[in-house]
Amino acid sequence: MSTKFDPEKAENLEEIEKQFAVKAVGHAQTYWQLLEAVPPKSLKLTKIDDEIYDDFLEQFPEYKANPSMVEVIDENVLKSQENKQRWFKFMNAYEKKVQDYTFGSLLRMNVKEDYTEKNTMFVPRMQFYVFEIARNKLGMNDHVYDSAKSSK
């Protein structure tokens, strides 16, 4: 069958959606286990964490001015029409540098809470990296490691 596939006209098949969800949940579980096992400040999510972090603060200075926006992410602000364009431009700069940069990932909205249905949003992998790199550098994920360490 050699028909051309048009992603704009493709239907979201339930099975494909389930596969994406399973993969995203697996990624979240693995990341949580890393946070519990390794001090977050020493955790590297990509080979270019520092570059991503510096570029993020330069392209999105509001997060540098107000780190609480990294701690508790407002999904409406993040996914606003204005910010969609900014994020699209930012993420595309990493197309050849970060593997699976557009793949869907689960991101906790409030860093102080676990992955739950109410505290999770679906974002491109690059946004996950940006916020979790920032959270790790700012010590916002330390509580996960400290809690796991003290319960052993």
Residue positions per predicted region:
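Nuclease and nuclease-like effector domains acting on nucleic acids or nucleotide cofactors
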Residues: 1-96, 132-152
